[in-house]
Amino acid sequence: GKAWQYTRDIRYAEKWARLIEDWIDRIPLTEESEANTWRSLEAGLRCEYWLRSVKLVQDSGVLTSQLREKIDGCLRTHGEYLVRKSGEFQKISNWGVLQNHGLLLLGVYLERSEWTALALKRLDENLHRSVMADGSQWEQSPMYPLRSAAQCCRCAAGSATEQSCSAGAL
């Protein structure tokens, strides 16, 4: 998407379309794929990155109505999956923040208020569980809490609102 935006070379947008369609066709959600390509961490991240990339190529002409329907269908599958993927581990780890940030964005994008509310509830619980009294984060690695904090700040600042999602703030 970014290569298309920077160069306006249609080959980049066409390649993006082929890659995302190929991924959707070849990597369905199965019990087996939940252990690798469909781990909840990657599924949450994919929501954000796919929504961003769709926005980047939308003026290229490659985003046909058929491809858009296919992407939206796969994103609905992501949302349904993320709704049911929640356990004690996600309530304290960066995985919970990243997957629920994805669910939050999908809730806004697909106008599923119940997903948005659930994601916000889970993010709030994660924040209260994973941040210690001294301000340190449970993961004990600077990368994880910074990424997690950035996602929480985006949510708190309203970058997951319908207006900002449709305006390209993703």
Q: Predicted segment positions?
A:
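Aromatic-lined, polymer-binding surfaces characteristic
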Residues: 1-170
